[in-house]
Structure formats: structure tokens, C-alpha cells
């Protein structure tokens, strides 16, 4: 497989005039996220599953400059570990695969169609506030805010309501991105209805059934995190 990829890099997988094709959507999303301050300094990542293919933004490339020909493509399903067993069917030879890959795969194994990883400052700040106010094992909670309606209750359960309490688990950061995978899987098991996991002092992983849902859920969460930080400054409780 490695020799085949080297000789025939399957460029047709990322060549499409369709703006909704993953190879076109990922660069567009990364530019938006960069402009919103979510993926500065090459940080963060985005991945989309379409059928039995997974499209992933590369590592170490400025997110606002990513082009379709920079995109990696994996067969799905594919092993998470070891990295050498992952079934790449398109691998730009001059670039490195995303360190987020096993975490994206974890979301796709649970039925996600898109997974987004950001380094949002608001996400980082709420992880620190939760740790200081409630301890290292607590999750982020907020209620009685209209934007909560933008977050699902769980698979097939509709959306949260104004009076519901949104809960987002928080895991501890690690020295290497891939080492977060076990903690992410554990958080998903403990909170089976969640569509996001915060990483303390790092950022957040958000996934959805498709690209639009993952993006809008990520936007709603970032709004709520920013609001929570401002509420904390004013001494206002997050849960009423």
C-alpha cells in the first residue's frame, strides 16, 4: 500500500469542482476558523468523513493557506494504532499527517461525519475556570442561555432546551496530541450524549453528524464559552 501511494498518489480524490466536496470544504473551513482566532500558528485541525473515505487537513501548514492538494485521505475504517497501520490512500509526500488523526477517528467510529479541533481562547479559559472553581474532575456546565438550543441532547434525541443544563467533559492535556486519544474515548463513554470534549489548557474537539452540524455546534459552544468567561467576571452563575 505504501509503495502504491508513493507511485500513484490518487490526486483525483481531492480534485472536484463541487464546493461541498471535503477537499474543498476543509480549506474553506480552516480559513474561517483562522479568521475567528481558533487555529492560529498552524494549531487545530478539521476532518470530514464521506462514505468509506476520511479527509484530513495536514499538520504544520498555516491553516489559512491550506489547499485541496494538501489534504490527506484515509480508508475508513482504519486502525488508530500504530500509525504505520493506518490505510492512507492519499498522502502528500512533502507533508506530515495530522497528530489529531486518532482523535478524529474516535469520533468517526461513533458515527460522526465531521470533527473539528480548535485552540479557541474561550475554550481554554473555561477549562481553567472550572478547575479553579470546581476542581480537576468537574465538567463545564451552563443553563438558561438561549444558545444552548444549538447543541444536541444526544443522537436522535433532538436539541437541548433553554432550561436544560449543557455539560461538556474536560480531559487533561498531554505532551503529544495523539496521547489524548484514550482520555477522549473515556470521556465519550462517560458522557455518551456529548458532541464535544474540552482539553484543559489546550482547546476543544467538536463533532457532528455532518459538516454543517459540527460547524454550527462549534460556533454555539464558542459563544457559550465566551459568555461564561464574561459572566464569571460579573459574578454571575453559569447554572441557574
Curated annotation (Swiss-Prot):
EC number(s) on file: 4.2.1.109
Location(s), subcellular: Cytoplasm
Region (Disordered): 1-20
Residue spans of biased composition, Polar residues class: 1-17
Pfam families per the UniProt record, alphabetical: Aldolase_II (PF00596)
Entry GO terms, CC: cytoplasm
Binding-site residues for Zn(2+), renumbered to this chain: 117, 119, 202
UniProt pathway annotation: Amino-acid biosynthesis; L-methionine biosynthesis via salvage pathway; L-methionine from S-methyl-5-thio-alpha-D-ribose 1-phosphate: step 2/6
Cofactor binding note from Swiss-Prot or TrEMBL: Binds 1 zinc ion per subunit.
Superkingdom as given in the UniProt entry: Eukaryota
Keywords: Amino-acid biosynthesis, Cytoplasm, Lyase, Metal-binding, Methionine biosynthesis, Zinc
Cofactor list: Zn(2+)
Function: Catalyzes the dehydration of methylthioribulose-1-phosphate (MTRu-1-P) into 2,3-diketo-5-methylthiopentyl-1-phosphate (DK-MTP-1-P).
Family of the protein in this entry: Belongs to the aldolase class II family. MtnB subfamily.
Protein name: Methylthioribulose-1-phosphate dehydratase
The organism of origin for this protein: Neosartorya fischeri (strain ATCC 1020 / DSM 3700 / CBS 544.65 / FGSC A1164 / JCM 1740 / NRRL 181 / WB 181) (Aspergillus fischerianus)
Taxonomic path: Eukaryota, Fungi, Dikarya, Ascomycota, Pezizomycotina
Gene: mde1
Amino acid at each position: 500500500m505504501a509503495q502504491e501511494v508513493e507511485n500513484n498518489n490518487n490526486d483525483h480524490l481531492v480534485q472536484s469542482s463541487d464546493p461541498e466536496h471535503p477537499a474543498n470544504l476543509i480549506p474553506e473551513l480552516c480559513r474561517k476558523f483562522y479568521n475567528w482566532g481558533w487555529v492560529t500558528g498552524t494549531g487545530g485541525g478539521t476532518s470530514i468523513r464521506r462514505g468509506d473515505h476520511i479527509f484530513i487537513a495536514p499538520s504544520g501548514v498555516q491553516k489559512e493557506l491550506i489547499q485541496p492538494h494538501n489534504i490527506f485521505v484515509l480508508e475508513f475504517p482504519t486502525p488508530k494504532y500504530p500509525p504505520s497501520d493506518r490505510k492512507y490512500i492519499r498522502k502528500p509526500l512533502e507533508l506530515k499527517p495530522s497528530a489529531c488523526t486518532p482523535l478524529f477517528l474516535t469520533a468517526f467510529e461513533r458515527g460522526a461525519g465531521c470533527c473539528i479541533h480548535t485552540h479557541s481562547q474561550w475554550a481554554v479559559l473555561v477549562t481553567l475556570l472550572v478547575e479553579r472553581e470546581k476542581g480537576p474532575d468537574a465538567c463545564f456546565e451552563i443553563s438558561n442561555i438561549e444558545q444552548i438550543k444549538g447543541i444536541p441532547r444526544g443522537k436522535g434525541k433532538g436539541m437541548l432546551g433553554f432550561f436544560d443544563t449543557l455539560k461538556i467533559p474536560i480531559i487533561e492535556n498531554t505532551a503529544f496530541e495523539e496521547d489524548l486519544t484514550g482520555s477522549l474515548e473515556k470521556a465519550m463513554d462517560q458522557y455518551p450524549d456529548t458532541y464535544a470534549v474540552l482539553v484543559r489548557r489546550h482547546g476543544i474537539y467538536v463533532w457532528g453528524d455532518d459538516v454543517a452540524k459540527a460547524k454550527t455546534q462549534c460556533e454555539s459552544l464558542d459563544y457559550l464559552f465566551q459568555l461564561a468567561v464574561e459572566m464569571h467576571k460579573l459574578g454571575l452563575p453559569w447554572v441557574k
